[in-house]
Design a protein with these regions (language model features):
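Feature captures C-terminal
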Residues: 2-168
Length: 168
């Protein structure tokens, strides 16, 4: 997403079940891994708003009866919603599941500098999440910078054409 958008940050959620890629990737593999017809948007987000959406993702974690980190019931009941946990690129942070909900993101920084409430960033995410879906209402308050009206599957294929050998 960063490659195609030029944004400072990126946020992505993955499907509940992912087929994954083999050593040689086909178009079918890409479609199976990213089955949604989403496109990308870039919006402007403040440090405070960024922390708020990251706190929503941090709600994903809980502790089981033995004290082990697990997935929170709120992401499992009444239906499994792993796709509502978002991954973030372009910032450093720590999630501390021992803290109460709303106070779990620690050490949020960009390029080694603390992300302050009034700081402004550009973030790339899919159009579904930008609509506020999944409990991410804050995105609806973020000004749109640009839309990339190409479906994700096509962008992923373009990336593989440009970079045919990728190490993971």
């Amino acid at each position: 997403q960063l490659h195609f958008s030029g944004a400072m940050l990126s946020s992505v959620g993955l499907a509940n079940e992912i087929a994954g890629f083999r050593s040689e990737v086909s178009t079918r593999d890409i479609i199976a891994t990213y089955p949604y017809p989403n496109t990308l948007v870039v919006c402007e987000i403040t440090g405070k708003q960024l922390k708020t959406v990251m706190e929503r993702s941090a709600e994903y974690f809980a502790y089981d009866k033995d004290g082990n980190v697990c997935v929170s019931d709120s992401f499992l009941i009444p239906k499994v919603e792993h796709y509502n946990y978002d991954y973030y690129m372009g910032v450093d942070f720590k999630i501390n599941p021992e803290n109460p909900i709303g106070s779990r993101i620690e050490g949020l920084s960009k390029d080694g500098k603390p992300a302050l409430d009034d700081d402004k960033f550009t973030i790339c995410l899919n159009n579904y999440r930008y609509s506020g879906a999944g409990g991410y209402d804050v995105y609806t308050e973020c000004p749109l910078v640009k839309e990339i009206n190409v479906e994700m599957v096509e962008l992923i294929m373009d990336y593989f054409h440009e970079y045919p050998y990728i190490e993971v």
